[in-house]
UniProtKB/Swiss-Prot annotation:
A lipid is attached at C17 (S-diacylglycerol cysteine). This is Lipoprotein LpqB. It is found in: Cell membrane. It comes from Bifidobacterium longum (strain NCC 2705). A lipid is attached at C17 (N-palmitoyl cysteine). It holds the Pfam family Gmad1. It is a lipid-anchor. Disulfide bonds: none annotated. The lineage of its organism: Bacteria, Bacillati, Actinomycetota, Actinomycetes, Bifidobacteriales.
Length: 576
């Protein structure tokens, strides 16, 4: 029997990464040491509320018809396949409307207003008008379930043409796609990680999608077989799956076993490729669980055990948290802070990364200085050129942002690599960055004329997991301005925060999200937060912050838990 343990992993940049293996990828404070229990595989569950919308009432006014359509759309995504929603449309409008093609996500309350239709009513219609809906759109989904945030300060107006026939109003013209409130979003869309394989062939990348609850399994298999989004192009292992399709447009569950029937295209794959495909489908359907029960066939041939010898797992290394405190390097991994090295002379350090094999410190003058495992200096990095920020990468890598914010520099075991971002606008610059636990994604805080917010791009790796390049594209995961710190809390969740203007802590914002996905506010402790990171603190996975007084606090239990002091008089705490 194969077993995979998922991990929450993210290293703090002023913190170090002490590699061990741990379980779980949920945002909860779980022990990462002690005895191991074998638990039955479980499927992701959400407290969903099922809606039961009503169809149009006789003699309803145009605004009421459009409001009723809005009330019925969530159930269409979630359960009824738009059966009730289509009752608000004319026959021709219903035939041309595809609710699954896209989604707009809005906050607040829509405003419904009618206006005259300057185009004469079609033949057979008694009259025609337009109801315009004004919304605060915060994000959107494309047909593949990829989320893109929008600037919620800008309103959007959606027109719906209605016609009156036989005394009843119906919507006769509208754009395809659904419009869903933020309150309904996670009730009707399920988060699914479509597991992609990196160019190294040794790392799995969770490609986050949001798929309708009513048929998410069918959609998920389709996405495994489809092309990856552009921001991951060039960082994934070539699959050659274009000829493989679902034999039937459904993925049933029989006797608690998911059944996936593919066409003969899978038969053309070699044994290794076929095993990898089956493994990716298993992990995607099972939320990273390699024991998820599946029956997979290709043109009648059973391939359910084709991945029996595939060793690729969703396991991630965890990060041991270290601080630079009064010239000492301190580990916070155990229940009591422990000195593990001496690094005097960095009282004004701007950043710090460390692991059991050593690390680096970003000095006050912007120069990055190498540190040995005992804290002693091992020279300067990046030819002594000043850097804006540093963070920990994969297996002891040190990533740095150039002083002008236009280039990235990476040091790995003495080898240094310079990287440019093809998608970065001419007037944009990088403020900070974080490397994902598996090392194949970058989250970057960007400010400038063309882009403001948090972007994500892919990292290509060689067979030995060393860096080989970056994707030529990026995707925006947040439009929040003035982000100066960010960290991957685990392989799915990203946490980021702003620096408040003029030291006003009440104006400091922090958010968390499955990236890309909708953002939720992250509660911070009192004071002005200057840096954040995540890793092992007091034997548990936690988010840590340091404030302007040098106090390190960590949140326990969950990201909504209480904040407790972990260390004080801290000089530097970076963010991965």
């Amino acid at each position: 029997m194969r077993r995979v343990t998922r991990t929450i992993a993210a290293a703090g940049a002023a913190i170090a990464c002490c590699v061990t293996m741990t379980a779980c990828s949920s945002p909860f404070d779980l022990p990462i040491s002690g005895s191991v229990q074998t638990l039955a595989p479980v499927e992701q569950q959400t407290q969903r509320v099922y809606t039961n919308p009503q169809g149009p009432a006789d003699d309803a006014q145009p605004e009421t018809i459009v409001k009723g359509f809005y009330d019925a759309m969530p159930a269409g995504v979630q359960s009824d396949g738009y059966r009730v929603a289509r009752e608000f449309l004319t026959g021709s409008a219903s035939a041309g409307w595809n609710g699954d093609s896209a989604a707009l996500v809005y906050s607040g309350t829509p405003d419904f207003r009618r206006r005259a239709n300057t185009i004469s009513a079609p033949q057979g219609a008694e009259s025609s008008l337009i109801v315009e809906v004004e919304l605060q759109v915060v994000g959107s989904l494309d047909s593949h379930g990829v989320y893109t945030p929008s600037n919620s300060t800008q309103t959007r107006r959606l027109p719906y043409t209605l016609m009156k026939k036989s005394g009843q109003w119906r919507i006769s013209s509208l754009e395809s796609g659904v419009v869903i409130s933020t309150a309904d979003f996670e009730q009707v869309f399920r988060q699914v990680s479509v597991y992609q394989v990196s160019t190294s062939g040794k790392q799995l990348i969770p490609d986050i999608r949001w798929l309708s609850w009513r048929n998410w399994r069918t959609q998920a298999v389709g996405e495994v077989l489809s092309d990856a989004p552009s921001w991951l192009e060039g960082v994934l292992r070539g699959a050659g799956l274009s000829t493989i399709k679902l034999a039937v447009d459904s993925v049933p569950v029989k006797n608690n076993v998911v059944e996936i029937h593919l066409n003969s295209g899978i038969n053309a794959l070699n044994e290794e490729e076929r095993g990898l495909l089956v493994h990716r489908i298993r992990l995607t359907m099972g939320d990273g669980n390699a024991e998820y029960a599946l029956r997979i066939t290709g043109d009648g041939v059973d391939y359910s055990d084709a991945d029996a010898n595939v060793k690729l797992t969703t396991e991630q290394p965890t990060a041991g948290v270290y601080t630079l405190t009064g010239g000492h390097i301190v580990s916070l991994a155990s229940s009591s802070p422990l000195r593990v090295g001496e690094a005097p002379g960095y009282d004004d350090a701007r950043g710090f990364v460390f692991s059991s094999s050593g690390g680096a410190v970003l000095r006050a003058d912007g120069v990055v200085e190498c540190l040995k495992s005992d804290g002693a200096s091992c020279g300067v990095m990046f030819s002594g050129e000043p850097m804006r920020s540093i963070t920990e990468g994969l297996d002891g890598e040190v990533w740095a942002v150039s002083e002008n914010g236009r280039e990235l520099h990476v040091s790995d075991g003495g080898k240094e690599t310079d990287l440019k971002l093809d998608w970065l606008g001419a007037a944009d610059s990088i403020v900070a960055l974080a490397v994902s636990p598996e090392g194949c994604r970058l989250a970057l805080a960007v400010e400038g004329e063309d882009t403001n917010g948090v972007m994500m791009t892919g990292v290509a790796r060689n067979g030995d997991k060393t860096l080989s390049g970056l994707s030529k594209a990026a995707t925006q995961v947040s439009v929040l301005r003035h982000v100066t710190m960010l960290t991957f809390y685990n392989d799915l969740n990203l946490v980021y925060a702003t620096t408040p203007p003029e030291g006003n802590s009440e104006q400091q914002e922090a958010w968390r999200q499955m990236a890309p996905g909708p953002a939720n506010a992250q509660r911070l402790p009192n004071g002005i937060i200057t840096s954040m990171a995540s890793g092992q603190i007091s034997l548990s996975r936690r988010l840590a912050i340091v404030d302007d007084l040098g106090i390190v606090r960590s949140v326990s239990g969950s990201l909504d838990g209480s904040w407790t002091i972990a260390d004080s008089q801290v000089t530097a705490l970076g963010a991965q």
